[in-house]
Amino acid sequence: MKRALWFVCVLALSAMAAGPLRAQNNPFLGTWKLNLSKSKFDGMPAPKSLTRTVAAEGAGATYTFTGEDADGKAIEYSFTSNYDGKDSAVTGSGMPGGADTVAMTRVNSNLVRTILKKGGDAIGMSNTEVSKDGKVSTVKLGGVGPDGKKFNAVSVYDEQ
């Protein structure tokens, strides 16, 4: 009986330790600053500044974006995703294309694919990749804005 109880305790402790280990293996976590000189925006204005902060949250992560758009207005939006392809609500303002939900899927350890949606309809897609050394994150984004015009961007972020 004591041996069975000990075994159950070891299993429980192992399960609790697995969460932080999974988070440590997520190269997307951290604070990332947009490098405007290495980024390109087509069909949409480049922001004056943008910082992406990614924090572990359960099986996934919470993404928070803050900065200033081309007109000097504040950008501040966030969402939490488990990388399971399910819709996650976006709160705040400044999300590309006016998206109100995102559906994120982890393609591999360094690549996440995101579908941007507005009112349940897909309006864009992005692929976010972290370099092997973990110092650069590149977001390739394409979609259609609220005005019906196509937009594309390659945003390069440096890890802080």
Locate each region found by the language model.
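Bacterial N-terminal signal peptides
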Residues: 8-16
